[in-house]
UniProtKB/Swiss-Prot annotation:
Keywords: Chloroplast, mRNA processing, Plastid, RNA-binding, tRNA processing. The gene is matK. This is Maturase K. One of its GO terms (molecular function) is RNA binding. It is found in: Plastid, Chloroplast.
Length: 512
């Protein structure tokens, strides 16, 4: 335990005071404009559902000053004065809006030391700032290179803490002033009470669902704590030196990649060394789902599952069911990760070998990493978004019928381009044509609904080339990337995997 405490003190930053700049009107943007924070997550605008504004540090600063002048922090705690804003409804919306903005400002402040820690760690490891670690597609080349050489995989659903106090306790080592922890508890209890009003007010529910920056930060801190201690316990059971690992801060998520973690696994009582041949462990995670793959046998994966379950139980004080960690062989198992269906294909080949006058055939097997577009979950997402029925029959989008023709076509075209861009790494892109077909007819039906016509009459009047760019956008991009001298033709380009290193978050229509 003393060794663990020393490890925690060595790696973590000093405790911070957060409530002082929040209450005393210190300009938060001056902290964010520090040279070490340029280009960090604080400059990316976040859309505000139900408002024309976009969340920014300047907006947070102005609202904090306004609340300070009106002593609004007192009214946030005191719910009895509900007529201050002219009625219960106006008070509820104003109360919720100010509470959300203060929570966002609080989350911006507590993110600053994490960003400083990220910059300092990258400078120590001499990691260039222009790296492609911000792209979530950078995980797939790693899987493509490593997964085909491994035997077993375990896809893990990281459990959510059952109580908000667990999240507060995790931050106690970072936050020194007690009032900040009390303010954090206040936000969490307000969020918990807000969920009780979901049935009575769906607008507030949608608003709270899209504005969870503080709660994402808390959850990411919890996951980062899991991986932080995972590295420590791995080092305790390590007989071979492992390479360095790190956690990188995205706009709204942490994700970590630990490559080439070489271990020799001991049993639970540290008595006998298991004779496991080359037990190479690979770990990747995005949001709440992680993948643990190994070249070792099934017993090694069961040991890791036993460790995870006990770790969550004794360190975070909640029980996690073992069925949340599925252990399967990579040769006969497919699993979902970040909107893709991943698997390892076995391609048998017969190689003819000629030795002098004798010739014989040698059977060999080549493993290949395969990425598939899950069409059925995508159709389900389109159905929830009211683009089609549950069976995939295209329907009109009535909420967009009041827009101009250009805006309607642009929105549908943007969805198609984003999906094509996100699934550029699939080896079977022709399966995406059905999704484009649904969106194309949904666009035609929406335009027909606006002009009080039928989709058939609209398509006959505009011709077969209507919305053809939905289907040719990807080919135009590929023709620009690959010259005509490339060995493969554009007709077969749907088999080529192209990982895009400019995607920073998962697509809204993709089921994670």
């Amino acid at each position: 335990m003393e060794e663990l405490q020393g490890y925690l003190k060595k790696d973590r930053s000093p405790q911070q005071h957060f409530l002082y700049p929040l209450l005393l009107q210190e300009y938060i943007y001056t902290l964010a404009h520090d040279d070490s924070l340029n280009g960090s997550i604080f400059y990316e605008p976040i859309e505000f559902i139900g408002y024309d504004n976009k969340f920014s540090l300047v907006l947070v600063k102005r609202l904090i000053i306004r609340m300070y002048q009106q002593n609004f922090l007192i009214y946030l705690v005191n719910d009895s004065n509900q007529n201050r804003f002219g009625g219960h409804t106006n008070y509820f919306y104003s109360h919720f809006f100010y509470s959300q903005m203060v929570s966002k400002g609080f989350s911006v402040i507590v993110e600053i030391p994490f960003s400083r820690r990220l910059v300092s760690s990258s400078e120590e490891k001499e990691i260039p700032k222009s790296q492609n670690l911000g792209s979530i597609h950078s995980i797939f080349p790693f899987l493509e290179d490593k997964l085909s050489h491994l035997n077993n995989v375990s896809d893990i659903l990281i459990p959510h803490p059952i109580h908000f106090e667990i999240l507060v306790q995790i931050l106690q080592c970072w936050i020194q002033d007690v009032p900040s922890l009390h303010l954090l508890r206040f936000f969490l209890h307000k969020y918990q009470n807000l969920n009780k009003t979901i049935q009575s007010n769906k607008t507030i529910y949608v608003f709270s669902k899209e504005n969870k920056r503080l709660f994402w930060f808390l959850y990411n801190s919890y996951v980062s704590e899991c991986e932080f201690l995972l590295v420590f316990f791995h080092k305790q059971s390590c007989y071979l030196r492992s390479t360095s690992s790190g956690a990188f801060l995205e706009r709204s998520h942490f994700y970590g990649k630990m490559e080439h973690i070489i271990i020799v696994c001991c049993n639970n009582f540290h008595k006998t060394l298991w004779p496991i041949k080359d037990p190479l462990i690979h770990y990747v995670r995005y949001q709440g789902k992680a993948i643990l793959a190994s070249r070792g046998n099934h017993l090694l994966m069961k040991e890791w599952r036993y460790y995870f379950v006990n770790f969550w139980q004794y360190y975070f004080h909640f029980w996690s069911q073992p069925y949340r960690m599925h252990i399967n062989s990579l040769l006969n198992y497919s699993f979902y990760f970040m909107g893709y269906l991943l698997r390892v294909l076995i391609n048998p080949y017969a190689v003819k070998n000629q030795m002098l006058e004798n010739s014989f055939l040698i059977d060999t097997v080549i493993k290949k990493f395969d990425t598939i577009i899950p069409i059925i979950p995508l159709i389900g997402s389109l159905s929830k978004a009211k683009f089609c029925t549950f069976s995939g029959h295209p329907i009109s989008k009535p909420i967009w019928a009041d827009l101009s023709d250009f805006d309607i076509i642009d929105r549908f075209g943007r969805i198609c381009r984003n999906l094509s861009h996100y699934y550029s790494g699939s080896s079977k892109k022709q399966s995406l044509y059905r999704i484009k077909y649904i969106l194309r007819l949904s666009c035609a039906r929406t335009l027909a609904r606006k002009h009080k016509s039928t989709a058939r009459a609209l398509l006959q009047r505009l011709g077969l080339g209507f919305l053809e760019e939905f289907f040719t956008e990807e080919e135009q991009v590929l023709s620009f990337i690959f010259p005509k001298t490339t060995l493969f033709t554009l007709h077969g380009s749907h088999r080529e995997r192209i990982w895009s290193l400019d995607i920073i978050r998962i697509n809204d229509l993709v089921n994670n």
